[in-house]
Amino acid sequence: MAVETGTSGISTQFQRYFSKELLDYIVESLQLVQFAQKAPLPAKSGSKTIRWFRFDEPSTGAIETLSNEGVKPTGERALSLENVDADLVQYGQVISITDILQLTELFSHVEQAVKVTGQDAALHADKIVRNELGSNVTGKQTRMANGLADYAAVGAASAADAVVEFNDFLDCTTQLRKNNTPMIGGNYVGVVSPEVASDLMKTSGWQNAASYSAVESLYKGEIGRLWGIRFLQTTVPFLSDGSTQHTYDSSGTVHSSFVFGQNAYGVSDVASQSPYGPSVYVTDGASKDDPLNQKTVVGYKSFYAAKTLQPKYYVEMYSKTNFS
């Protein structure tokens, strides 16, 4: 009987081949920061607080009928200046990479650390804006999907009874127009979760972005339009549990969709510590804390704040979703 030698008998000589083509990893779709009013804080300004100003709304209360010729009005219209303050907070993150890892690595961990640090900074900044809009802002406009009475009713309802309907976002547009909210490029902007977007796309009046992209430039992440609102998807939506209205819950079933016009909210823009284009520091070399140069440290820092500037200029729509 012939003896045949195959790979199974000498399998210990074979080693794994490692592909140097890295697989893609999940990167969140972020939308809110691009529509914020950005306020610079110059270096050596003597403050850690940014203050936005606005004059009071137009009013006819001081206009008088002048019954007698040559007689001036008896009263005067007073101007008042309102302000909104935001205290900046410093944030930071570091990634330490050992010399042994760098000596034996298949991939450049320093290069990847720089890349992921920038993505982490952008994600963190967007979450700060999201949490500000979803917080208990005085005077915020809210709407409930499917004609439900209030947030508690949305929380108690089934998904089918709390899903967004065709006319729900018309109410958002109407509310903003009633408040004289300035538009952004002739439309309002809506930022929704992918699940709510799925529900919206099934409504009869939905207009896909592809149908008007030839004549209008699209925002990053834009998916379509309805009732004068251009919708964008975010994968980091504000979720809540149906009982605690203004508290983010990653496993919450109530989705907050934000519809807004111009200057609804603002963020700081400190050139040297901005999370949008952060300065990433790579520290290498022996020091008192690392005398043998055993670590390379990659990190960033930001000095940042987000604030609602005019609560009348945005609407938070609460809903559930049929997506499962």
For the regions a protein language model found, what residue spans apply to each?
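N-terminal "assembly arms/tails" that initiate or stabilize quaternary assembly
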Residues: 1-86, 318
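Sequence/fold signature of self-assembling virion shell proteins
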Residues: 2-33, 151-173, 197-324
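Short, low-complexity, charged/polar segments at coil/turn and helix-coil boundaries
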Residues: 24-62, 134, 163-214
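Beta-strand elements of well-folded, non-transmembrane domains
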Residues: 56, 99, 302-306
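Short acidic, glycine/tyrosine-flanked loop/strand segments centered on an H-E-D-like triad
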Residues: 77-105, 277
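Short, solvent-exposed loop/turn segments at the edges of secondary structure
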Residues: 88-90, 185, 293
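Alpha-helical scaffold segments that mediate packing/assembly in large oligomeric complexes
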Residues: 101-178, 195, 324
